[in-house]
Design a protein with these regions (language model features):
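Bacterial N-terminal signal peptides that target proteins for export
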Residues: 1-2
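N-terminal signal peptide c-region/cleavage motif recognized by signal peptidases
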Residues: 11-13
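Tryptophan-anchored aromatic micro-motifs
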Residues: 18-32, 95
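N-terminal targeting signals for Sec/Tat export/insertion, comprising classic cleavable signal peptides
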Residues: 27-49
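Contiguous, well-ordered beta-strand patches that form the walls/edges
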Residues: 32, 50-82, 88-101
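Extended soluble regions of mature proteins
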Residues: 46, 86-87, 112-113
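C-terminal partner/receptor-binding element of secreted or periplasmic proteins
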Residues: 90-119
Length: 119
């Protein structure tokens, strides 16, 4: 039985590269995090404090994988149909897809994201 399960698990096709040039921006418990896919790798974009104020910071988080239902980035799983974000079993959020880097970059409107901040 275990052998059957292992053979079944490893025969499921997993792909990368098919979403290169596209990105998603997710809202996870009020925080904004984006992932842009290029060269079979995922790059994480977050808003962080810089020298003169908030800025978007890029970090290579490694290879990504896809199947017909999900995108996998390390311990993150994103449903391709409804763009639901899940990290481990507790961190959840919603994402929006972008077809190219310019539209993806435009999704990080820092002024709009902080307009309701009290301090």
């Amino acid at each position: 039985m275990i052998l059957f399960f292992l053979i079944s698990l490893f025969s499921i096709p997993v792909f990368a590269g098919e979403i290169d040039g596209k990105g998603i921006i997710c809202n996870v418990y009020g925080d904004t995090v984006g992932y842009f896919f290029e060269s079979d790798r995922a790059f994480e974009y977050k808003i962080a404090g810089g020298d003169k104020g908030l800025e978007v910071v890029k970090k290579d988080v490694g290879k990504y994988y896809t199947n017909e239902n999900s995108i996998f980035i390390n311990e993150i799983k994103i449903n391709r149909k409804d763009l639901k974000y899940q990290k481990f079993s507790s961190f959840r959020g919603n994402c929006k897809a972008y077809d190219n880097f310019n539209s993806f970059k435009g999704g990080f409107d820092i002024e709009k994201l902080i307009e309701n901040n009290k301090i």
